[in-house]
UniProtKB/Swiss-Prot annotation:
Record bears the keyword Ribonucleoprotein: no
Pathway in which this enzyme or protein is active: Amino-acid biosynthesis; L-tryptophan biosynthesis; L-tryptophan from chorismate: step 4/5
Gene3D superfamilies: Aldolase class I
GO BP term (any one): L-tryptophan biosynthetic process
Keywords for the protein's UniProt record, in alphabetical order: Amino-acid biosynthesis, Aromatic amino acid biosynthesis, Decarboxylase, Lyase, Tryptophan biosynthesis
GO molecular function: indole-3-glycerol-phosphate synthase activity; phosphoribosylanthranilate isomerase activity
The protein, known as: Indole-3-glycerol phosphate synthase
Naturally occurring in which organism (per UniProt): Polynucleobacter asymbioticus (strain DSM 18221 / CIP 109841 / QLW-P1DMWA-1) (Polynucleobacter necessarius subsp. asymbioticus)
UniProt similarity note: Belongs to the TrpC family.
CDD domains for the chain: IGPS
Catalytic activity: 1-(2-carboxyphenylamino)-1-deoxy-D-ribulose 5-phosphate + H(+) = (1S,2R)-1-C-(indol-3-yl)glycerol 3-phosphate + CO2 + H2O
Name of the coding gene: trpC
Length: 267
């Protein structure tokens, strides 16, 4: 694990202990089960939404709702998650990815709830999931999918967390950065596989990360390239290599209107 991931995971363990002393796992489970019976809050089908776009010949874009990052600081001063969500939906996003980590990304659960309430597209809870408590919490706040980062987890942990997510109707995006992590990710059932082009040790970004791992990704997986997609040329490079799902954040967060930036990048 990288230094920054070590710090984040250590913080996350403290956060989970603190949160579970305030709201029990049982309470989150009850809310999650109630949400699953609610027309407004039942899962919207995160993977399906991406695959629908791809089947229609379009890019399946997961658009990020992110106020700040450890490497870049504040990305967007005028940050209203509901408005950002509506702008993305209007301009053709498949899904949203909402940062809920407070210590490193200045996110919160309310941003996810506000974004989801403002649109009809599915929402990924973008956080550092290390404990089943967070998965019940994710469904309780209305998330449609969760993220599992291989660099943060042992294989047996990932399998337990994935099973918990699927039991609640949540889709899972599993994220890797290198070949050993990819090998572990392929042990999971989820068809949704993200390759992060950002090295979490150095924060350097290279699109070659996705391209170099491409031949090892089975055809039955939906591959999402994450980070570093900043230009039309980047999009065209990926689509030329039959990569049609993208997770994009920073490029949109810095734009005056995130949705307009989305439609320009994926025109």
């Amino acid at each position: 694990m990288s230094d920054i991931l070590d710090k984040i995971v250590a913080t996350k363990k403290i956060e989970v202990a603190h949160n579970s002393s305030k709201i029990s796992l049982g309470n989150h489970r009850e809310q999650a089960e109630a949400n699953n019976q609610s027309n407004l809050l039942k899962p919207r089908g995160f993977i399906q939404a991406i695959e629908r776009k791809i089947s229609a010949g379009k890019a399946g874009v997961i658009t990020e709702v992110k106020k700040a990052s450890p490497s870049k600081g504040i990305l967007r001063e005028n940050f209203i998650s509901a408005e950002i969500a509506q702008s993305y939906e209007k301009h053709g996003a498949a899904c949203l990815s909402v940062l809920t980590d407070s210590d490193y990304f200045q996110g919160c659960n309310a941003y996810l709830q506000e974004a989801r309430a403002a649109c009809q597209i599915p929402v990924l809870r973008k956080d550092f999931t290390i404990d089943p408590y967070q998965i019940y919490e994710a469904r309780a706040i209305g998330a449609d999918a969760i993220l599992l980062i291989v660099a943060c987890l042992e294989l047996n942990q990932m399998m337990e967390l994935e099973a918990c997510a699927h039991e609640l109707g949540l889709d899972v995006l599993v994220e890797v950065h290198n070949a050993p992590e990819l090998e572990q990710a392929l042990e999971l059932k989820t068809p949704l596989l993200g390759i992060n082009n950002r090295n979490l040790k150095t924060f350097e970004v290279s699109l070659q990360t996705t391209l170099s791992l491409l031949s090892s990704v089975p055809k039955n997986k939906t591959l999402v390239t994450e980070s570093g997609i900043l230009s039309r040329a980047d999009v065209e490079l990926m689509r030329k290599n039959q990569i049609n799902a993208f997770l994009v954040g920073e490029a949109f967060m810095r734009a005056p209107d995130p949705g307009t930036a989305l439609s320009e990048l994926f025109a």
